[in-house]
Design a protein with these regions (language model features):
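Glycine-rich hexapeptide-repeat left-handed beta-helix
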Residues: 109, 116-130, 134-136, 142-186
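Domain-scale signature associated with acetyltransferase and cell-envelope carbohydrate enzymes
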Residues: 1-115, 120, 136, 154, ...
């Protein structure tokens, strides 16, 4: 009986979330329809500040009120990894470039991923953006910054507090520092 009640409750939560969010983001391991998984809890918790109070109202997927996203249309990610948008203090700036987040990639709190910078000669202007690509199963440590044009290969680990200024497309490595450099291969 309890299992049936839980399924009915999840069904109503699903219908409620489908009204407010795009259905393509309500799938995957975070949104299991057999039990009340973390995705459903996070979507309900974010609904009021996001959709009623108006914080990031236009974004079609649930995000924490502590996350800043500039131009969500230029961000590509797996619906299994929606939890990256609940990591507090993260900043995703995709104004003049795209951000690709590979499947299984984890982004810790207070990370920044940016695709463009200001022009050094005229700070009111931005230079042309460059795409940022994070491979599959990467781990971006807390307080790290990924700068425009960076591409990280699969299974790259970025140490906490790192500033990644260049690409490490070979993957399977640990990088850290400011600027980030390869520490070791995995």
């Amino acid at each position: 009986m309890k299992r049936k009640i839980v399924r009915i409750f999840i069904y109503f939560v699903y219908l409620w979330c489908c009204i407010w969010y795009d259905k393509k983001y309500l799938v995957g391991e975070n949104f299991n329809r057999e039990h009340f998984s973390n995705g459903w809890k996070k979507a309900l918790r974010c609904w009021f500040p996001q959709k009623v109070l108006g914080y990031a109202r236009n974004i079609p997927f649930p995000i924490s009120k502590n996350v800043m996203i500039v131009n969500y249309n230029n961000i590509t990610f797996s619906s299994d990894d929606i939890s990256n948008f609940f990591s507090p203090g993260c900043f995703y700036q995709a104004t003049k470039g795209k951000i690709y987040i590979g499947h299984g990639t984890m982004i810790a709190p207070n990370c920044g991923i940016i695709t463009t910078n200001h022009d050094l000669n005229d700070l009111k202007k931005h230079v042309d953006g460059k795409d940022v690509k994070l491979g599959e199963n990467c781990w971006i440590g807390m307080n790290s910054i990924i700068l425009p044009g960076v591409e990280l290969g699969d299974k790259t680990i970025v140490g906490a507090g790192s500033v990644v200024t260049k690409s490490f497309i070979e993957g399977n490595c640990v990088i850290a520092g400011n600027p980030a450099r390869k520490i070791k291969d995995l």
